[in-house]
Amino acid sequence: MNKEQFKGKWNQFKGEVKQQYGKLTDDDLKEVEGDYDKFQGKVQERYGDEKQAVEDWAENWHKNNT
């Protein structure tokens, strides 16, 4: 998923990411606001070693929602 695709699907994505990964707060999601680089940073901050699993989930979500 590229940055433009991420931004375009942000409103759909943020609700599902919040359900799947509850460590990402509403404030985190407001800060990210469709920016894939910021999303990756927040995932790293909140999930550390699980970063790749979260990114894989995001990629799979995108494939299933395009």
Please give the residue ranges for each predicted region:
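Intrinsically disordered, low-complexity, hydrophilic segments
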Residues: 1-66
